């Protein structure tokens, strides 16, 4: 079997596989990464101290303005699972339903669901050594169980491609199937609109909402896409479906960026996705406007999710709250209603 | 770098999840098997310039997610496709059973004249076969499709599938059955043919194209 040629050994300063099991790409820029990391480590240390103090205090993790500010500045890795569980309401659900996850897996089986999940097991994070068949332990089993339990728990959604990346990512971070299950439930059941159901109406709606926001905030980009007849589905459906996992390339440097986005997603809700999308587009507006055709537009939208802008997660996360300008939940709700009505009328 | 070509054809790769659509596209474009691949979310895109019957043709290929529910998202990309690879997995009867639905989508949403080649992929897994060659060729005949069994792993018949589809479209253009100028034909003239159209006839014979069959 032919395989892509591998480059020679990586430089001694870095490991080929990051602490989460992701293989670094051959063109990984170790020097730039080290430079970023040495600055970011100082931030992480400072944040870790502040978080320890916050979590020791009596007020704990109620959703206060302080907690929101802290979360926007990044949750330290050691507290991440706990914070996600608390602010998303997953912890409360888990405590109210002890043993529920295990019971789902022991319950009645659904061969169709199992088959759909099986098709994607080896296609989830193929560049992560822990998800490989030969890994000990192999996370494919945990992934399969979490997805299966979720499909049985929420038969209206069942399994939709993209959920595998989200569940896989939750497993890597929480290292717990049950916690991953409840966090997945928080995302799909409460935080996100109907992205994954059979009609994918929430996904289609939010794509249109983003298009509307771009029309108002970045009219030249909207005109470019409209002029070439490019539907927003083509360039952004993966952003919504995968919540930027596997979009922003997943080695640890950028993984930080996705983690930071998810910190805010669990606490502040789906609005964050629009902030990230608008920031990516706005930051690269001139670059996108160079595109001359449909393939070129697709390619540019792919490229803007790479490079130093997204790697430098601390600056990136500051920008998502300033770059796109005001974005009230009232606006989003109003746009969701009108776009949804328009989509339903088209059917 | 500017590419010159006589025609541009829009192609689709459609079929159920896990049949190897993206691997076929990857094999065709990169000439190798994609070992560790993610499944496609939404729509992906690839292109390659090929030489068919003395004409250079740029194939603009849209690769779609196979899971049923994504069809409502990917259907918008069918419009104006000139050709399609309709893919099933020879080791999965289920993927074969859903061919009719995919075909209806292609003919109603792209164009009734879309040129479709049926590809029975994973030919290299013959011991696990669930769909016979004969059965699939009968289906192809009944539905006026071309048919090949392919292997994205070994590359067998992959190039042929794309070229056969392109050649048929070119023949239909030559015979007048397809009109590239019709809106939504999925066919565009490239720079090369536009130049030829503008040049006096005598200049056209200067650079004969090699035959790529």
Swiss-Prot record, chain B:
Residue numbers of 5-glutamyl serotonin PTMs? 67
Q: Does the keyword Translocase apply?
A: no
Q: Where is the lipid attached (S-geranylgeranyl cysteine)?
A: 211, 213
Give the GO cellular component terms, alphabetically. cytosol; early endosome membrane; insulin-responsive compartment; perinuclear region of cytoplasm; plasma membrane; recycling endosome; secretory granule membrane
Question: Which membrane topology describes this protein?
Answer: Lipid-anchor
One Pfam family of this protein, by short name?
A: Ras
Q: What is its EC number?
A: 3.6.5.2
Q: Describe the PTM.
A: Serotonylation of Gln-67 by TGM2 during activation and aggregation of platelets leads to constitutive activation of GTPase activity.
Short motif Switch 1, span: 39-44
Q: What's in the keyword line of the UniProt record?
A: Acetylation, Cell membrane, Endosome, GTP-binding, Hydrolase, Lipoprotein, Magnesium, Membrane, Metal-binding, Methylation, Nucleotide-binding, Phosphoprotein, Prenylation, Protein transport, Transport
**Presence of keyword Isomerase:** no
N-acetylalanine PTM positions:
2
List ligand-binding residues for GTP: 18-23, 37, 39-40, 66, 121-122, 124, 152-153
Please give the residue positions where the record annotates the modification Cysteine methyl ester. 213
Kindly state a single biological-process term from the GO annotations of this entry: Rab protein signal transduction
Q: Which residues bind Mg(2+)?
A: 22, 40, 63
Motif Switch 2: where in chain: 65-74
Which InterPro entries is this protein grouped with?
P-loop_NTPase, Rab4, Rab_GTPases_membrane_traffic, Small_GTP-bd, Small_GTPase
Effect of altering residue 67 to L? GTP-locked. Interacts with RUFY1
> Where is GDP annotated to bind?
18-23, 121-122, 124, 152-153
- Coarse class of the primary localization is membrane
Cofactor(s) named in the record: Mg(2+)
Query: What does the annotation say about its assembly with partners?
Result: Interacts (GTP-bound form) with RUFY1; the interaction allows endosomal tethering and fusion.
Q: PANTHER family in the record, alphabetically?
A: DRAB11-RELATED
**Family as reported in the entry's similarity comment:** Belongs to the small GTPase superfamily. Rab family.
Q: What name appears for this protein in its UniProt entry? A: Ras-related protein Rab-4B
* Record lineage: Eukaryota, Metazoa, Chordata, Craniata, Vertebrata
């Amino acid at each position: 079997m032919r395989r892509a040629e591998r480059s020679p050994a990586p430089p001694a300063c870095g490991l080929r596989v990051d602490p989460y099991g992701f293989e670094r790409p051959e063109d990984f820029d170790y020097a730039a990464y080290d430079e970023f990391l040495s600055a970011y480590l100082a931030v992480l240390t400072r944040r870790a101290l502040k978080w320890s103090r916050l979590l020791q205090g009596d007020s704990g993790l109620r959703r206060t303005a302080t907690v929101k500010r802290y979360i926007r500045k990044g949750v330290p890795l050691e507290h991440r699972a706990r914070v996600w569980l608390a602010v998303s309401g997953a912890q409360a659900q888990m405590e109210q339903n002890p043993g529920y996850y295990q019971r789902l897996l022991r319950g009645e089986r659904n061969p169709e669901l199992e088959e759909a999940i099986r098709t994607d097991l080896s296609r989830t994070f193929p560049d992560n050594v822990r998800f490989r068949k030969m890994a000990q332990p192999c996370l494919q089993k945990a992934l399969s169980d979490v997805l299966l339990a979720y499909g049985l728990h929420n038969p209206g959604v069942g399994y939709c491609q993209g959920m595998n990346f989200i569940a896989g990512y939750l497993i890597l971070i929480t290292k717990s199937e049950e916690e991953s299950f409840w966090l997945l439930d928080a995302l799909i059941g409460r935080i996100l609109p109907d992205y994954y159901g059979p009609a994918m109406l929430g996904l289609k709606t939010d794509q249109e909402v983003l298009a509307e926001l771009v029309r108002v905030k970045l009219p030249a980009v909207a005109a470019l896409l409209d002029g070439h007849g490019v539907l927003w589905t083509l360039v952004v459906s993966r952003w919504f479906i995968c919540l930027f996992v596997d979009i922003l390339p997943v080695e640890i440097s950028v993984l930080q960026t996705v983690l930071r986005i998810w910190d805010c997603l669990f606490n502040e809700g789906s609005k964050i996705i629009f902030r990230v999308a608008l920031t990516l587009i706005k930051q690269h507006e001139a670059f996108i406007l160079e595109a001359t055709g449909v393939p070129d537009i697709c390619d540019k939208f792919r490229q803007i999710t790479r490079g130093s802008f997204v790697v430098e997660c601390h600056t990136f996360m500051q920008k998502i709250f300033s770059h796109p300008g005001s974005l009230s939940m009232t606006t989003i709700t109003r746009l969701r209603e009108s776009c949804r009505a328009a989509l339903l009328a088209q059917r | 770098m500017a590419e010159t070509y006589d025609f541009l054809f829009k192609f689709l790769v459609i079929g159920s999840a896990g049949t190897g659509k993206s691997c076929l596209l990857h094999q065709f474009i990169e000439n190798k098997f994609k070992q560790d691949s993610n499944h496609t979310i939404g729509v992906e895109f690839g292109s390659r310039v090929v030489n068919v019957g003395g004409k250079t043709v740029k194939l603009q290929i849209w690769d779609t997610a196979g899971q049923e529910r994504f069809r409502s998202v990917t259907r918008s990309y069918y419009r104006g496709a000139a050709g399609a690879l309709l893919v099933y997995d020879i080791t999965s009867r289920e993927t074969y059973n859903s061919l009719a639905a995919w075909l209806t989508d292609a003919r109603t949403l792209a164009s009734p004249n879309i040129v479709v080649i049926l590809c029975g992929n994973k030919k290299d897994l013959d011991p696990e076969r669930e769909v016979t060659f004969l059965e699939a060729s009968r289906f192809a005949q009944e539905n006026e499709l071309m048919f090949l069994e392919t292997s994205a792993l070994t590359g067998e018949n992959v190039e042929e599938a794309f070229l056969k589809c392109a050649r048929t479209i070119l023949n239909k253009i030559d015979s007048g059955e397809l009109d590239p100028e019709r809106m939504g034909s999925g066919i565009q003239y490239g720079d090369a043919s536009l130049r030829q159209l503008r040049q006096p006839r005598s200049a056209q014979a200067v650079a004969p194209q090699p035959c790529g069959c």
